[in-house]
Regions:
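Primarily secretory-pathway and cell-envelope proteins
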Residues: 1-59, 108, 112-168
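Mid-length scaffold segments of soluble, non-membrane domains
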Residues: 59-111
Length: 168
């Protein structure tokens, strides 16, 4: 049986590039014919327990990794029952054991740790569900739902969602 010299291989293994740990992604979706998008960082689970550990309960979370998560709509929307005028915003979440909230914030262009509550436009409740299998990469989706859409965010064994529709 061939053998491997672990001590000799270790420096090369340790020096290999890891790549981007939390790659950026943009997801687009249609809301009554209008293109909305979310630009966000996608952290990996890497075997960790996420909510309540990596992302603590009852603390505003950047909803992704690195730079703040941005959301753009060219039309006025209703997000979870709250009015969101056309524009670009940042999205934050407040996870708790008793329920989650989505925060739409007016400040843009900042790092994900630079949250200012005084710039909040709205806070809305999110629907929370437990998934049967863990999701490795934090994932945002905008899925068709009638004339509107559902904004869904999934990571580990948790999925949160909120309806979005064009304001009439």
């Amino acid at each position: 049986m061939p053998s491997v010299d672990i001590a000799a291989a270790a420096p090369d293994f340790a020096a290999r590039p890891l790549g981007t740990l939390s790659p950026r992604d943009t997801v687009r979706g249609a809301v009554d014919g209008s293109d909305v998008w979310v630009h966000y960082g996608r952290p990996s689970r890497r075997g960790r327990e996420i909510f309540g550990r990596v992302v603590p309960w009852d603390v505003v979370w950047r909803t992704g990794a690195n730079a703040a998560t941005h959301f753009h709509t060219p039309v006025d929307l209703v997000v979870g029952g709250a009015d969101v005028p056309a524009g670009t915003y940042t999205l934050w979440t407040l996870p708790s054991r008793g329920g989650w909230q989505l925060i739409v914030n007016r400040q843009t262009g900042q790092w994900g740790t630079d949250y200012h509550a005084d710039r909040d436009l709205v806070r809305v409740d999110l629907q929370v569900e437990t998934l049967p299998a863990p999701v490795e990469l934090f994932t945002v989706a905008i899925e068709p739902d009638g004339a509107g859409a559902m904004l869904r965010m999934s990571w580990d064994r948790t999925r949160v969602s909120v309806p979005i529709a064009r304001k009439r």
